[in-house]
Amino acid sequence: MPTINQLVRKGRKAVQEKSTAPALQKGFNSLKRKSTDLSAPQKRGVCTSVKTITPKKPNSALRKVARVRLTNGIEVSAYIPGIGHNLQEHSVVLIRGGRIKDLPGVRYHIVRGTLDTAGVANRMQGRSKYGAKRPKDKK
């Protein structure tokens, strides 16, 4: 417990919050080849590898993950949501923030239905999250 005199001299230090998606906080100036502070809701990147990972202890599955090199030069792991995907090496993808709780080190999601990523086929509910188009009415 500090004394009043210590508080008058130094004061309290505000705790700085850490970002949950730090790769989205950095930009890149290609002319000056310098990284800049530029927050963005999504970022574009190129897949360097696509693989499956097993989750942490109580869960069991093969989760689909892509390693993505972003336009700011940072390389991150991003989860591929939905059933089935068409991604491979050199696919151009859009990533957003959002971690996968049972995959350590995976802090980003790939946005389905944009750039080279196809939407989920035969998806009827929650279509907007998976980039699926509205099905034609059968009459």
From Swiss-Prot:
Residues 1-21 are annotated as: Disordered. CDD domains: Ribosomal_S12. It comes from the Bacteria. Gene3D superfamilies: Nucleic acid-binding proteins. InterPro entries: NA-bd_OB-fold (IPR012340), Ribosomal_uS12 (IPR006032), Ribosomal_uS12_bac (IPR005679). The modification 3-methylthioaspartic acid is found at D102. It holds the Pfam family Ribosom_S12_S23. The keyword tRNA-binding applies. GO terms for molecular function: rRNA binding; structural constituent of ribosome; tRNA binding. Belongs to the universal ribosomal protein uS12 family. With S4 and S5 plays an important role in translational accuracy. HAMAP family: Ribosomal_uS12_B (MF_00403_B). Part of the 30S ribosomal subunit. Contacts proteins S8 and S17. May interact with IF1 in the 30S initiation complex. This is Small ribosomal subunit protein uS12. It comes from Alkaliphilus metalliredigens (strain QYMF). The gene is rpsL.
